[in-house]
Amino acid sequence: MAAKPQLRPSTARAAEVRPLVMRCGAFGDMVLLTVLLQQLSLRFGKPVDVISSGPWTQPLLESESAVGRLFVIRSRRTPYWLSLQQHRLVAWLRERGSGPTWFCDRGEGRGLLSRAGIPDDYICDTNAYTWAPTDTFADRYLRLGSYTPKAFEGLLPPAKPGVPAAARLNIAPAALRELEMWLAERQLTGRQFVIVHPGSRHIARRWLRPRSGTSKYWPEENWAKVVTAVRDVCPDHAILFSGTRSEGRFNAAIIRRAGVPDVYNVADDLSVGTLLALLQRAHSMISVDTGPAHAAAALGCPTLALFGTAPPILYRPGGTTTPAIALTGTVEGRQSILGITPEAVIDAWLDLLNTARTPLSDIS
């Protein structure tokens, strides 16, 4: 019987280090990342350390039991010698020790792992794998979390079966309390409400230019027709328009066109934590393909997302099994949000509400 190869003691020790994930993504990207974090946490039986960026990441992940240490940096593109944050990150990585690592960005930031002394064969890099065109991001993350870095073959526990192909968010108790106060201040306590999120950062940046040049712009008159239909179907529900401060003017233009009562423009009126608590409680959400739509679906809110040019299967809100519909249209044979009619949105929203009454396990 052949003897087993001698194992380097350093590699054996490194296999015991908590798993590390690096993903510096937008709001929705970080929501979807929770699928991988859940997969790895269950696989290793311990929380996962995370390197990320963006002011939304802390409130999104701070209550996740799958997350251990969260290290947020402002930028990966700043030259290393100019970034105190990057120096601190590298120092922390060296102190924690190298271990199984999953890199989930396009390329920026990989050099920071190298500076910290993490060997290439300790890393599963998402760019090194081929993905099926029918995969959602949740499917990809489940598969990525089942892979083992080359150096640790035979040393790590296998992936656990049965991890849902859906993002998961937990809301901090403080955010729930903040929501109660927020609702009370606006005399919305006990009310049901539908959330509409028509804007995106791409639209907001084009305030002085034609918005039709951005892939996520859907005309104000279309949104107004949808809002009117929502009011007819849900006469007793409040309608809340969410968004950032720069998206507030777009919201206001739609609200003026719709001319229906009991509509609130709450753009820039919500912290990330309070927004999550609001989404969890909402009757439903109608949105462009944007981060809050992923969060709403992950929180169990029936979510209809209007897609521009992004792949609707890959970026399906919240993953594979959430209560969501990714709606697309075509113009001259090409996928375009401008090919979606208000009637299609209303019909899809009504279908979604009927589907959402079935158990989540039955939703595909």
Task: Give the residues covered by each predicted segment.
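Catalytic machinery of carbohydrate-active enzymes
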Residues: 1-364
